[in-house]
């Protein structure tokens, strides 16, 4: 077997994704649906919405401070219906599930620092200093040249497979499929470049009267082959479709789900580091979310400008303070400029204060539910502000000026 991820010339790396009907992803979508509904009416609302689903029950809880009202049970049932849990025989559906809510206001101790940052309390008048970070912590962003969307290949393919699994269910190509499902892709790398697909794993929930043989043949033909590039497949590529032989009972009937349980699926599939904070259900004053988006935006624009083939950025904050505590980068020996100059470019072109992030990326808008399944990053089918490459020309101009000055 090949050596694992590291500095070896040949290694395997695996990432997974899940469909929108996975229990944890149901929760993410509900939490972000609540956030979108509130922020559409009250853009400055403070929202921290958590969801749990289990057999026949949805619980929505959290801390929300807002001037508006939204009908949460109605939102919950709408999300469940959109996903496809609409038949009683699934054991969980939009009409018969119970919905409980337990919502409190944001802690006034937290609000003290978020609503008025330490900088503002000290008399600074820059309006971008007014909003303090919603929590302490470190956040990471990453980009690489492996795919057109500047994402690692394993997670990119895994997301596309999971999304395709939902598509063939919804469009009737494979009408016997049910909403729950997972995918996993193992890529073999040679000298840091993707060489071939070692294995593809699909778990697809299905009706009880379909044979394993039919499911396996249908999934390979209608899901895997249309997604995986043929030049990466060979006679040694292994396919695992419903490896236990049966996947009838799924969704919240078989597994309890929670918001924020799929943080690597949401980001880089384990290819880059993660600070530990989840995204869904959080308004953009929570740097767990907004700073991760900003870090991705920075990394993607720097890589697209040719500064490195792989770049990871870490940003750290303290609650109630606008300016980050630290900013650091790792380029994995692919940089075409020293790290000090790259950091100076980041400082020149990207403002990492929470209010600046919110304004520059336009984050006080109902744009979040669409990110709650199939990845928050590297989504070419969505017009996500943190995926835009609108800083590349300015970065290149700065690179030229630095070269001239030296």
Swiss-Prot record:
Residues that coordinate or bind ATP: 22, 180-182, 246-247, 255, 261-262, 278, 282
Main location: cytoplasm
Catalytic activity, EC: 2.5.1.6
Binding positions (L-methionine): 63, 106, 255, 286
List of residues binding K(+): 50
Keyword set includes tRNA-binding: no
Known cofactor(s): Mg(2+); K(+)
Subunit structure and binding partners: Homotetramer; dimer of dimers.
Family, similarity comment: Belongs to the AdoMet synthase family.
Protein name: S-adenosylmethionine synthase
Record lineage: Bacteria, Bacillati, Chloroflexota, Dehalococcoidia, Dehalococcoidales
